[in-house]
């Protein structure tokens, strides 16, 4: 599991605004025909006429100048470094040929090698570890002068090249520290070589502006076109709000107060709209409250809304293994088997799936009728941490095939049955085996809860997510506990489309902006970066062009 476990806050503010439901009838949740059409009366709400504009928004490509010498190369043998912990040097060749006098074995995250190097110029360098691991896919943490720099994935059980590309280094003398990212996963380091890096390939950020749903609303198409336009040029700031308070949550208030800037993306969780939570005492207005917050953010503030759903398992399957009902989204807290519900072994379980999706559809229909596009991120973290193969939510616990079937079921139910057309589908399965296919996904997401003060770009996770499909798709840091340094990310190519910091302890401490996970200096750097978009810097998204190339050609 991630280094830090997020806390899901289950509390509805008594002061929250309740949105009245406008002309939306429940569909028959007992229906098993996902291709049929829902019998609903939809609200016909008009909006102001669109006058397309980009304003003075800059969409120039971002090319980072590299001042490193073109032919620079420096190799340091691992055994020449200072060893600590239980790190040991060996000259046995059971891992293949090595250079120098031997290589270093590291087994615990406290085992370290310190190496001294002098960098000739500020610039971008490739860092090649000739290394091996007991388990292919293990990682080596590379730090510089005590600060986390980058994670290098070791892909072989024999000594071979494992390159961390485009690492940003400053001129001067430095101490490079190497240690296993994960405890009890042995890694072996033969040498480390620094060479000048090539420029970032900008072609990877060219993404089609066609959504998976051909009937997507105009507002949704405009937002998605904006996202494709800024991908690789900016990272959009985001923050999850606690206590269903939306923009009035303490996170948003404190960020504005201390940083003078507001996150562009408001993160909301439909957890309390789960029918089993309402059956156990959550407010029946929970979904309406969330809808009101989303509408206010889009319509009145001009911001972007993302939604996840900590889907509480249906009532008969709760309180498993001594866990409370409100823990029902965790796989160990419920007896619900997704596989059995989908294969017909648990017919009642399947009907509950349809009931719950239909309940959430009521919230999404309100937003669709009110022209509010949503970055919709259901069934998040389905594969858990792929390194450990440990799905922690029930929707991933039955394996990849069941997860993909549920994703397609939900996509069909919301899109083709309920005709909800305001959703940009963000897949956050964490494991390529859980990927349902390009036709069901618009954006790829990954959730990262890094160690405290690890402001590295998490490029290994970015590359891992990007490689899920051969189709160029936007890659987003859909949840995070620690903010990454945008200078590092834009230099090494891990240009996450957005970040969305989780609420509570990852943002606040004693009702103030917290430095427990992200340092206060990094908070300030991120929210003042020219590469990070805040709410105040967003263009007019309601009037953003549907086709930017055509708009620019017609408005020279």
Task: Identify the function of each model-found stretch.
Residues 275-409, 420:
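Substrate-binding cleft of extracellular glycoside hydrolase catalytic domains
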Residues 50-220:
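Extracytoplasmic
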Residues 25-32:
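Bacterial lipoprotein signal-peptidase II cleavage site
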Residues 431-454, 502:
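Aromatic- and acid-rich polysaccharide-binding/catalytic face
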Residues 56-67, 195-271, 276, 280-284, ...:
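N-terminal module-boundary/linker segments of secreted carbohydrate-active enzymes
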Residues 473-556:
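Substrate-binding cleft of secreted/luminal carbohydrate-active enzymes
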Residues 377-379, 407-432, 473-482:
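Aromatic-lined carbohydrate-recognition surfaces of secreted/lumenal glycan-active proteins
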Residues 20-23:
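C-terminal motif of bacterial Sec signal peptides marking the signal peptidase cleavage site
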């Amino acid at each position: 599991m991630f280094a830090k476990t997020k806390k899901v806050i289950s509390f509805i503010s008594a002061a929250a605004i309740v949105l009245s439901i406008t002309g939306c009838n429940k569909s028959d949740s007992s229906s098993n025909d996902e291709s049929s059409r829902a019998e609903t009366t939809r609200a016909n709400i008009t909006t102001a006429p669109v006058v397309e504009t980009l304003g003075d928004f800059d969409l120039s490509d971002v090319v980072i100048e590299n001042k490193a010498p073109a032919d620079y190369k420096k190799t340091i043998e691992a055994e020449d470094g200072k060893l600590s912990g239980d790190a040991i040097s060996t000259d046995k060749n059971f891992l293949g040929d090595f250079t120098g006098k031997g290589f270093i074995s590291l087994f615990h995250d406290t085992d370290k090698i310190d190496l001294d190097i002098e960098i000739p110029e500020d610039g971008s360098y490739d860092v090649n570890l000739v290394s091996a691991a007991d388990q292919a896919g293990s990682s080596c943490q590379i730090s510089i002068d005590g600060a986390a720099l980058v994670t290098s994935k070791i892909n072989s059980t024999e000594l071979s090249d494992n390159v961390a590309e485009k690492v940003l280094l400053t001129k001067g003398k430095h101490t490079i520290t190497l240690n296993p990212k994960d405890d009890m996963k042995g890694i072996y380091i033969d040498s480390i070589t620094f060479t000048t890096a090539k420029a970032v390939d900008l072609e990877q950020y060219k993404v089609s502006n066609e959504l998976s749903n051909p009937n997507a609303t105009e507002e949704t198409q405009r937002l998605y076109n904006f996202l494709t336009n800024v991908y690789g040029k900016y990272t959009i700031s985001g923050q999850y709000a606690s206590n269903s308070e939306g923009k009035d949550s303490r996170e948003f208030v404190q960020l504005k107060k201390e940083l003078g800037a507001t996150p562009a993306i408001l993160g909301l969780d439909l957890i309390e709209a789960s029918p089993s939570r309402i059956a156990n005492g959550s407010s029946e207005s929970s979904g309406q409250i969330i809808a009101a917050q989303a509408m206010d953010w889009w319509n009145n503030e001009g911001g972007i809304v993302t939604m996840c759903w900590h889907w509480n398992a249906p009532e008969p399957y709760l309180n498993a293994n001594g866990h409370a009902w409100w823990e029902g989204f965790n796989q160990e807290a419920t007896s619900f088997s997704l596989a059995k519900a989908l294969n017909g072994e648990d017919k009642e379980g399947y009907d509950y799936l349809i009931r719950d999706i239909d309940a959430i559809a009521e919230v999404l229909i309100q937003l669709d009728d009110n022209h509010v596009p949503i970055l919709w991120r259901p069934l998040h973290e389905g594969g858990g941490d792929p390194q450990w193969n440990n799905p922690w939510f029930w929707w991933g616990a039955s394996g990849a095939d069941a997860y993909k079937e549920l994703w397609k079921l939900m996509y069909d139910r919301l899109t083709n049955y309920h005709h909800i057309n305001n959703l940009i589908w963000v897949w956050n399965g964490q494991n390529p085996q859980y990927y349902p296919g390009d036709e069901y996904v618009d954006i790829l997401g990954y959730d990262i809860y890094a160690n405290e003060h690890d402001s590295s770009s998490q490029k290994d996770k970015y590359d891992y997510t990007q490689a899920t499909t051969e189709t160029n798709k936007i890659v987003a840091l859909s949840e995070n506990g620690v903010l990454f340094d945008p200078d590092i990310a834009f230099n090494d190519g891990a240009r996450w489309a957005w970040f969305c910091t989780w609420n509570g302890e990852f943002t606040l401490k004693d009702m103030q902006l917290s430095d427990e996970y992200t340092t206060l200096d990094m908070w300030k750097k991120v929210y003042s970066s020219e590469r990070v978009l805040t709410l105040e810097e967003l263009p007019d998204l309601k009037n953003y062009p549907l086709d930017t190339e055509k708009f620019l050609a017609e408005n020279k």
